[in-house]
Amino acid sequence: MKKQPVVLIETKKVYYEDNFARLPQLNLTWPSVYQYHKDSYALKVLATYLSKGKKAPLYKTLVEQEQLTASVSMFQSGSEIAGEFMLRTTAFSNTDLDEVEKAVFKALLDFEANGISETDLSRIKAGQETDFYNSLSSVLGKGAKLAQYEIFAGDAAFINQDVKNILAVTPEDVIRVYNTYIKGKHYVATSFVPKNQATLALQNSTLANVVEEKIIEGAEEQFDASIAATYKKTPSSFDRSIEPPYGENPDVKVPSVWKEELSSGLGVFGIENNEVPLVQFQMQIKGGLLLEDANKVGVSNLLAGLLTKGTKNKTPEQLENAIESLGASINAYATNESVVISGNTLAKNYAKTMALVKEILLEPRWEEKEFDLIKQSTLSQIEQQKANPNSIAANAYAKLVYGENHILSNNLSGTEKSVNSISIDDLKQYYSTNMSPSITKFHVVGAVTASEVTASLSDINDDWESKDVTFPVLPELKTPENSQVYFYNVPGAKQSVLRFGYPALAATDTDYYPATIMNYRLGGGGFASQLTQQLRE
């Protein structure tokens, strides 16, 4: 299809008062280039450098200096005939988006003055190389990429040129595309603000013409679900009503899993796979919400967020640079039943990546400034959840299934009250009491041998103190004797969220796996499930 780049003759600013929004959001969009255009690679580097990480000009200005938002994202999105370079940020409550826009252009001026170094460029390209191989790590990924190259580049073999283009970007390219597509160029600005807070939108914005569906009670269309839908079928060269015969059962080659338990009690499980030069790992430390005080829910979530914000000997920015320079990613997060440290790295850098994991795990920095930022970000997320139907449903459903007094009935992030009551000492207490190798499992898959894995864990095994962790005895969950219907009203909601369920099997139950297969076929398998087919088809 013929390329049709967008040309703006003026900057356009529009706003919209959202009935359900809790926080103001600003989007800035510049016309850019289509997928696989020679400039798209430098634009992706530019977006990453400007917005991602502690060193990013946008992060430094909007998050750290001006404290207008918890995060800011920027990305280059290329399609078949055109593309867009987009910035998005959700500001804190009652923040004037004019101040946010002003801070954005202040950050861009900083970039104009300082540019991008070879070191930072190498760091970003290392991450992009890892992402490239990640996209090829499954059969689905390979098929999707080859199809995408055929459609957008006209040749599936472009896969080989794509990675070369990623690695060929220079600092001069990044400056050039900034000057060509961003600096002094017209853009589209959209301000989405809570109802009756139009003053938070950018000045000189016009009201967007958004047609809202009117919800009229009792006006729903009536239909008989027993009547099969009729529709005109697409012509076919063969009779699709005749089901083809089943072929032979596939010969599934289950990968070999090796196991080892280290002297500290740390359990290790691994699969060696050399198809792509990557290693992925996950360290699961049992606990999470299970070990929290009901009056201070959110401790494990905040702790996980703080673990990757520097170490004893590395500032947050230094740690981030060390990770990204390896083409790696290391994330920490909490779940209802664990605190998890996961990672993804080039195989050649696996040992160096695990050395950083050891620092993160055993030498936390405990920086008050970072704790305050994470706390503020969490409070902002909790506020946003109030406008998210799925979050509302999940929170209400957990209370009904587990009961008000069960620890798992709580939102993992906590509430405004509980998060505000948490101090950094609460995190230190959880860390010193509940983080132990004796309740930890390490899973690793990739181009790495068992001996290399155990060697990478030797320092963690030697230096991590094992302790007895006491888990609370949870009340037994009871299945309701009769079906019950609960309704949570969101006035003016445009859609409904339905949840059906009851307390069921533990993951250790012998029927758990058969039940997951049953559930997949019944309703959990997307378009392969009977429920979806009944509702959609």
Give, region by region, the residue ranges found by the protein language model.
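Peptidyl-prolyl cis-trans isomerase
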Residues: 169, 177, 365-366, 422
